[in-house]
Design a protein with these regions (language model features):
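Short gly/ser-rich loop at a beta-strand->alpha-helix junction or flexible surface loop bordering the NTP-binding
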Residues: 12-16, 39-84
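Hydrophobic alpha-helical interaction segments
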Residues: 93-165
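Short beta-edge/loop segments at beta->alpha junctions of small alpha/beta modules
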Residues: 1-42
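Alpha-helix initiation and capping sites
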Residues: 29-36, 47-52, 103
Length: 165
């Protein structure tokens, strides 16, 4: 790896991760993988199940329009932080039952509900979450029996809203 790096055929992204280098003449720069690609490779390398986390879930679900400058993901692995090209990537450990054997959209929905919290879940936000939940493949009644009570209640409200449309 060291020799290939010295030759310029590959470049080290971070400890243990390398990429083939591509030079783009038009912009006179090297091409590097996106943060999302690096996140996926880290998850693959450590065999983690991951899903979007933090403030980004609120943006992704349509609850908020703020964009975080830190890339936060929930995972079934340990909590870790990495720096990639000046950007912080943070993996936060979460209970496996929220992300294992579930769709990534369902995991994002759960994370968004947790991020908002019990006290700040008012009707407008629940309706936005319900709109997002239309694309979730899990049954919000049957597939949520092992989820924390207050989160399950929110999911049942979301299911009710979507059924009444």
């Amino acid at each position: 790896m060291h020799k290939l790096t010295k030759k310029g055929e590959i470049s080290r992204i971070m400890h243990g991760l390398y990429t083939k280098t591509y030079y783009i003449d038009i912009v006179d720069e090297y091409f590097y993988p996106s943060v999302e690609e690096v996140v996926q490779k880290l998850a693959q390398k450590f065999n983690w199940t991951i899903a979007l986390g933090g403030e980004a879930t609120l943006n992704y679900t349509g609850v908020s329009n703020q964009v975080s400058n830190v890339y936060i993901y929930v995972s079934d692995g340990p909590s870790r932080e990495y720096i990639y090209r000046g950007r912080k990537i943070s993996f936060k450990h979460t209970n496996k039952k929220y992300i294992k054997q579930r769709s990534s959209k369902f995991a994002v929905l759960i994370e968004a509900i947790q991020r908002i919290g019990k006290r700040d879940l008012y009707d407008k936000r629940i309706k936005k979450l319900a709109f997002f939940a239309q694309n979730v493949k899990e049954d919000l009644l049957k597939d949520t029996s092992n989820i924390i009570f207050w989160i399950r209640n929110v999911l049942l409200k979301i299911k009710e809203i979507n059924e009444n449309k």
